[in-house]
């Protein structure tokens, strides 16, 4: 076994990822990897991360002033009968060694996944190089992983190719490695024409409904689910939801099968970095505060409203929406409800970037409702922090939400979440009207204007009771959604796999 003496030696964990904070970030995945890898290192694990050396990474490394070491090693792998190569670099970030694969043909672009016109057409080649290159990197640095932890479809080639690709499936270097695959966003699945299987040396007989085929395409996420030792997702509720047709995005049947097979589907709640998100030390906000001294939160609200050009009266609670601008996040429901939200007495601030047509809609809406609405597209991190600290409430009307980090950050800053009851939102928010002792927010269940407005009516009625609202803020700020519990849980499942 890889670690019959697992209790005596450090667990060797190889993370393979397409983004990681502070090097390259598109969404919440980067936050998770940056924090979870460090948490596991703090739990006496030897954690290594492999990441593409994107243009963005090079820029951020210069800003971070971190020392990057070029290794005297190259990785090469055969894809589509061609040899694709990469230079290897190493950088240490806190207690974690990060290995960067440089290949300007695939990674030297301004964007990570897509342009405004759509995803890069060669994403199969790009992330195939990441996946196979990560395995070659492990061999090049002589790091025999006990656990290879893959994240989202961009790393799905690893479990598929280790199981089926000639030479790799018989490679003794990885004989004792176990594969954990985490689904962060099930709506992105890596769907390609059947020819991709020949490109990557995956046997054609796997193109069936029992293998990689789904709706006439080779589905990489499906393959990863089938051929990993353990599949996890980012909250207990979402792990149950994705086994249903409504949330499974076509993969519900295979997820149900995997779940029945030795409980090989588990939901582990993500966390946030409590050092990074801390209103007591945050240099970006107007006035620092804590759960023991919440008075300064109102100073943040007043100054934020002034900066945004909104009415500074406390009579109007400030409701924020901080999110990627996608249909998943329920932005359309918010926009359709804006006139009624303003009638209730709310002011609204929207921060985000994402789908081009939604950005254009927001610009038009901003011109229409300037008096009560402020919108920032592609906001700075400083403004984002000010909004978390200065808003009274956070709205998350998501169609589905695997985990959600915004509500955890909001709670940390005493900003009360008003959320739709789905996925990780149900694992982190307790409805105040249902449980005044433990409640930390407000939940609505139907994806409808009536249901959303009902939750906002309930929230503003508590807001108007200043004593009750202050207690609610204090309760919210005392919640603990740090990585302490989740990191320990991941280490436990690693050890169980290796036992």
Role assignments for model-derived ranges:
Residues 2-499:
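Catalytic cores of nucleotide-sugar-dependent glycosyltransferases that transfer UDP/GDP/TDP-activated
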